[in-house]
UniProtKB/Swiss-Prot annotation:
InterPro entries: Ribosomal_uL4, Ribosomal_uL4-like, Ribosomal_uL4_dom_sf. This is Large ribosomal subunit protein uL4. GO terms for cellular component: ribonucleoprotein complex; ribosome. Part of the 50S ribosomal subunit. Gene3D superfamilies: 3.40.1370.10. It comes from Buchnera aphidicola subsp. Baizongia pistaciae (strain Bp). It comes from the Bacteria. PANTHER family: 50S RIBOSOMAL PROTEIN L4 (PTHR10746), LARGE RIBOSOMAL SUBUNIT PROTEIN UL4M (PTHR10746:SF6).
Amino acid sequence: MELVLRDDEHSVLNVSDITFGRDFNEALVHQVIISYSSSIRQGTHAQKNRSEVSGSGKKPWRQKGTGRARVGSLRSPLWRSGGVTFAAKPKSFYQKINKKMYRGALKSIFSELIRQKRLVVFREFTIEFPKTRLLIDKLRDIKLHDVLIITKTKDNNLKLASRNLYKVDVQTVNHMNPRSLISFNHVLITSKAIQKVEELLT
């Protein structure tokens, strides 16, 4: 498969059909994205049940003879400042996904991006200084605004310039994830980065 370089239309980049020419497996992509989204949840929510809240364990009044409803504890969930019924506890939302499935989902996503012409390949994509205006002008020149930029190695200038832009993000190949890949209208990737992606997915 040949990909035309956007900044040099006379040059093409040869990539593997096995990696970038697959059918779109919607079920697999959905499963991997749900797993990824669940796994990044903190899961640190916590509440106190009736055994954990502070308060007396004494029975407020006797069981019978007062005319009032029977009560055994001031810490009951029915009472103000009592415990919480079915109190939330810290837990892990991690869902295991095999490496082969994860790689398969990434291959499927990249293949679909190419089919929909949403993957834009540049030989080089950099800015001279970490200035947001420079990045805005550069993206305006190539008519991209809702875009994920993927580089082979960390580019501090791009990262700093993109921090204050809506719907623009910069990631390295090692830090890209399936949710980011499908969250933007376009994915801009450098030729060195896509070669590294091919190495990782084969």
